[in-house]
Each structure stands twice: as C-alpha cells, then as structure tokens.
Amino acid sequence: MTQLARPDLARCPSGRDHVRPDCATSELVAAGHPERPRAARPVPGWVVSTAFLAPAVLVAGWLIGAALQPASYSPMRETVSVLAGYSGTDRWVMTAALLVVGACQIATGAGLTAVRLPARVLLILTGLSTLGIAATPEPATGPTSRHLAFAVSCVVTTVVWPVLVARRAPAQPWIVSVYGCATVTVIFAGLSCWLLIAARDGGGDLGMVERLTSAVQALFPLVVALALRQTAGRRNQRQRGQVTLTG
C-alpha cells in the first residue's frame, strides 16, 4: 500500500507568510539594487536673502542714521541705541532698520531647517530681542532696564548660537564643524566681553566696539546658510550621479 507523502510544512509557505519590508530591502541591496540615498535638505534661496539682509540693513541703518545726526554725535563714542533713542535726530531711520533686522533674523531662524531645532529657536529669540530693542527707545538720560535686558539677551543668544549649530557629521564645512563653531563662539565671547567692559568703563571707543561686535555676529547666520546650501547642493548632485550609474 502506497503511503501518500506528507507535505513539509517548513518548506511550504502558508498564506499567513509575508515578507518583511526591511528583509526585502536587504535582499534588493544584496542582489545589486542599492537603496536610493536620502537627499540632503537644501537651504532655500530666500533664507540666504534674509540672512544677508540682516547685517546689510544693520550697517546701512547706523551709517545713514549717523549721517543725519548733528556734528556733536560721535559714532566712535556713542552707541547705535542713541540713533534710535529719543535724543536722536530722525530716529525712525535706525528704529526701522532694527525692525527689519529683527524680522530677518526671525525669518532666517524659521527657514534654516538644515540646522537643528534648538539653533533655529535661539535665532528666532535673537530676532525677538532685536525687535525689543527697537520697541524700547533709549531716553536722553540713558538706557532703561527693559532696553538693557533686550540688549543683553541679544548678546547672549548670539554667543551661544554657534554651539547649537555645530555638527559632528562627516564631510561638513569647517565653519559648521565642532571645532569651527567652538572657534566662532570664543571669538564672539571675546568681542562681547570687550563690549561689556567698554560699556562699564564708559570708554571713548564704546560705539566702535558695539558696531564691530554687532556686524561680526550678524554675519555668521549668512556664513552658515551659504556653507550648508553649497554642501547640500554638492551632496545631492553626487547622489544623483550614483543613482544614474547604478540604474
């Protein structure tokens, strides 16, 4: 009597068997079909524009504002806040410039998605502090506590920002690497200490120190945006070339 062969359940897939997506991907890669690499997140052109406008409008504002002041005003000794203060002539020029700078900083922080979220939030806080400086004009008797609070907040957030921008990923521009951002932070901290000392001592170079510190610190978001935009473009172009060759 012939015995029917029993089916081998271990070798016969059932209807409940399914292929896991990660296993399928691994099999495709092993078979010579590599998974398409993820494209780098680009920096939009409008973010580069807002990052450029912030330092450009800041410098233009204090140059035009200083030109409208009487001969007694000295940009070497007196701060930018005097231009937007109640004692300044045509103070609307510097006030409008500060409003534009703050808005550009907020827009840059919102659109610079190539950096981590804490760095974006801190740049937005810097913009809000700049708006606060414009909203609290300095009286003729000197800066108010609210004005000083916004000014100090702007200095602190600007010094800390490079730390949050730093990246450990390979093939990154030096300026956004850990060592590059640490160097920038040390420079910003040194300039800020110089500014605080000049403000405390009431030296004759307070205006010059403030302008130098503000201009250098306002340029860094533009440098970061340009570096990340260029890196993302090169990486995406290289990945497209790899996909074309493997396809």
Predicted regions and their residues:
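Actinobacteria-biased recognition of intrinsically disordered, low-complexity terminal regions
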Residues: M1-T50, L228-G247
